[in-house]
Amino acid sequence: MPSQKVKGICTLIGALSLNLILGNHYTWACINVYYASYLHHNDTPNIKIQDAYFIMPSIILLGYIFFTIGVKIQDKFGVRFTNFLSGLFILLTFLILKYSSKFKINIIGFIFAGISNGLGYLSVIKNCWKYYPNNKGWVTGIILIGHGLCSFILNPIADFILINPNQEKTESNGFYNKNISNNII
């Protein structure tokens, strides 16, 4: 049987890892224009660049709404089930965004991202506090590093390596050309 110290360290590493995934919504600030360009060229020609800018605030707002729901689910069903739900919703988000070029369908994916963020964010923090009751601030800080570190890692990868490696400029209408915008998928 692993000791409490080993369980605490494993729980902290798991919480940090989950927040490395959940922090991906901050990356939308970087890729909004690419996403709008993708929709413009593929299925939603009348979309405006500004239409994509509601995504990140919406995900954050839904996350805040689902923080308390996630804690209630954790209290009733446990942290594993809560994190399973969080992982399931983020998986559904990625699948919807990968296989749909319809803006209205993608909105469901963004809703799922907010739900995932809300369910997973506080439940792992609360779980780690059981192992570190005298260091709650320290533990919370380590876990939340993952949230911010996600965009710190993903933004340059998305912008400079995957989507627009040559750093081409937008066309006169504000959108990127079809070759660049299709790199988002």
Please give the residue ranges for each predicted region.
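Extracellular/periplasmic helix-loop-helix junction of adjacent transmembrane segments
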Residues: K7-G8, T27-I65
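Hydrophobic core of transmembrane alpha-helices in multi-pass small-molecule transporters
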Residues: T93, K104-G120
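Conserved MFS/SLC helix-loop-helix module at the cytosolic interface between two early adjacent transmembrane helices
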Residues: I65-F103
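Small-residue-rich segments within alpha-helical transmembrane domains of MFS-like 12-TM solute carriers
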Residues: G23-Y26, G114-L122, G148, F152
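A gly/Pro-rich, aromatic-decorated transmembrane alpha-helix motif that marks the paired
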Residues: T68-I69, S123, T140-F175
